[in-house]
């Protein structure tokens, strides 16, 4: 399978640089997986698409202000993007600099260069950085960090992004990118869903900066997926098994929820799904056998990205590419701050040949 099979033309003007004034007022393109039929509407139509007893699975990770600016004590500007917090004093990070710092190099971070840190080790493309400060890493980031807006949002971060680029139910700090499908849910919509009898459960997957890395190989099977930490606790497992037992659907909110649930299913020894607390490198592309997820709420993804591959594996390649073509024609807003899709599973997707 070639990466170029997942290319589509996207006019620059369709990339959303700001969210809608109201979270749930975005547009919703619904794709019926088995038939490929498309329906255009608004996000609140979700209320009519979900049944009492269906289970919505959200990712409750919280985005940290993971981008830091500063300089090496020896001179030379640097930009630090946290990949993950290792403990209260250390981070693993990407560092952009004209010359990469060496172990032992002192860093002065923050717009006023008031925070002292040391680059202690290098792990491939990532740098281990230790803060020489009494405060915890999270406190330091909250004080001097910038929100890590995706590279295709071509503007500096603003104070408003600290809330807008965050789901209303975010709880566990650790992500450097928002699980963006969740951005469309506001409290009134969540209340209406609960009132209808829709069940809710929360996994945690701390989205890493690797989510924005382009696929740099020609053949999909050669791609090595970045690693992210995920948690699928017992209560989620119980809720999934109960929904399946009563004939209801498990609906993942976002590709990160999909990857968490399907990672837990892959690792399960005795049941459909079991608790999972580990790093995952799951790479979902056409031919993948879904075990847990029956429907998916997701945003529109980048051409040739691992996420459009995940959607193609779920709805079928042809149905997915047709939906994206229609979305471009209908001028849907794309990517993190853009519009959403509601997709039901296509059991025939696994048999589809791509690029032949």
Curated annotation (Swiss-Prot):
Protein localization: Cytoplasm
Pathway, per record: tRNA modification; tRNA-queuosine biosynthesis
EC number: 2.4.99.17
One GO BP annotation of this record: queuosine biosynthetic process
Transferase is among the record's keywords: yes
Enzyme class: transferase
Gene3D superfamilies: QueA-like
UniProt GO cellular component terms: cytoplasm
Keyword annotations of the record: Cytoplasm, Queuosine biosynthesis, S-adenosyl-L-methionine, Transferase
Pfam family, one: Queuosine_synth
Catalytic activity line of the entry: 7-aminomethyl-7-carbaguanosine(34) in tRNA + S-adenosyl-L-methionine = epoxyqueuosine(34) in tRNA + adenine + L-methionine + 2 H(+)
GO molecular function (one): S-adenosylmethionine:tRNA ribosyltransferase-isomerase activity
The keyword S-adenosyl-L-methionine is assigned to this record: yes
Classification via SUPFAM superfamilies: QueA-like
Complex formation: Monomer.
Function noted in UniProt: Transfers and isomerizes the ribose moiety from AdoMet to the 7-aminomethyl group of 7-deazaguanine (preQ1-tRNA) to give epoxyqueuosine (oQ-tRNA).
Record family assignment: Belongs to the QueA family.
HAMAP family according to UniProt: QueA (MF_00113)
Protein name per UniProt: S-adenosylmethionine:tRNA ribosyltransferase-isomerase
Organism: Shigella boydii serotype 4 (strain Sb227)
